[in-house]
Amino acid sequence: EEFAPGFKCNLINDVIKWIDPRVIKKLNLGLHGLNIYSPELVRIALDRKNKHISFYRDPNKTAASIAKQSEKDAKVWPDFNKYIDAQSQFLASLYEITPPNLPHVGLKDLWTMRSMLKPLRKNGTSGLVDFIRVAAMMMPELMDEWFESKLVRGAVSAAGIALINQGPFSAATGLNLLHQQVHCSSVFHNIHFVKGGMGKLAETLALTAQSAGTVIRTKAKVDS
C-alpha cells in the first residue's frame, strides 16, 4: 500500500517464512508472476551496547556475529542449526501426508504415511525422540540446553512465539519454532520477500485459479 506519495510498503505481513515447494511447482506460481527472493541478512537483534547480532543465511557468518556476545554460543551455533533443521524435517514430512479417514484407517491410508520414513531413516529413532521432546518444550527449556547470552536466547526464542498469541514460557512453543524452520535448509530466521509486495502473492494465486477455470466472486452474498 502507498502510505505516502511515492512510498509503498507491506502494511501487515511483510515476509514469507516458507511455501511448500510442491505448491509452487504444482500451481506453476512462477509462470504466473510470482518472484520470491531471499536476502543474505535475515534478522538483526539489537543490543544496547551496540554488540548487535546479525543473522545471515550463512551460519558461519551468524556465528561470527554471535561471538560479540558469547564465544561459547558462537561455537555451538552451527550445531544448533543442524539440530533444529533435523527436527523440522519430521514436520515437513508430516505436512506431506493426506490425513487418514479416521477411525477407519486402512492399508491405503498407512501407505500415504510412507513419507515419514525419510526423516526417520536419516535421523534414526533418536531423532524422532528428539523431535517429540523439542516439540513439547517451552523456549527457556530449549535455550538452557544451548545458549548463555540473553540476547541470543531472546532472538532465538522469538522464532518460537512468531505468529502465535503465546509467550516463550508457554508449553509446545518448541513445536512452533520447528514449524517456522520447515523448508529452511538450516537457515535460522529464514525469510523471503515477494517482489511487488505481499499483495502480489494474492494476485498470483488468483491468476492461477482463474487459469484453471475458477470464477472469483467478490461482494457476493453468502447464505449460511
Residue spans for each PLM region:
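Homeobox/homeodomain signature
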Residues: 6, 14, 24-26, 35, ...
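N-terminal glycine-rich phosphate/pyrophosphate-binding loop and immediately adjacent elements
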Residues: 1-103
